[in-house]
Amino acid sequence: MAHPESRSRAQGMTRRELAAVVDHTLLRPEATLADIDRVAAEAVSFGCASVCVQPSAVARAAEVVDGRILVCSVVGFPHGASVSRTKADEAATVVALGAAEVDMVVDLGALGDGDFAAVAADVAEVRAAVPSVVLKVILESALWSPSVLRQATEAAMGAGADFVKTSTGFHPAGGASIDAVSIMSSVVGDRARVKASGAIRDTATALAMLAAGADRLGVSGTGAILDGLG
């Protein structure tokens, strides 16, 4: 169940307030430097929390935003199938290039096996590599039963995640859902935060995710969503 403050925060939210909880995202692998320049500049103009880009685009995005907002990047994306050491190295690399937040994809196979110790170990290795940045752990929530999602959230949080995140936006199972956000929010309580991403394409959905307990949104169509607030 969403906290009452989550519901009240979403009601009457201003354009500026909504932008401040958005990671303006461009993760298409074919994105060009011109695309990165555009999205990074948009994120600054909107007043977003961050611009979220692929590792190869971090340095360029950091140059464009020039410290005015944060740069976020992804690790083990989108499948989560890299070994933990590789994820840790990738995380350290993107931080060195200018990322202040890291969104890692957890070992989805381990989740499917119910091996929550392996899930925690995967997260812990990345956490150890980048101890001073915000770490968000992508669980690909559409794949799992409520029970597995709860246990995955606990495992990620226990291993040092600052956020648990619903989705990559690339899996055919789907993106964020109100039910998944509500479950994840109920587990984390005040100990961590929730990022909803994937299939958030309009203002009503964005506000519903926040009302369900999301603290951050990952979206690509930020301008249209903000325009829904006038």
Can you say where each PLM-predicted feature lies in the sequence?
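C-terminal alpha-helical cap/extension of soluble enzyme domains
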Residues: 1-22, 28, 46, 190-230
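Conserved, mostly hydrophobic/aromatic
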Residues: 23, 61, 94, 137, ...
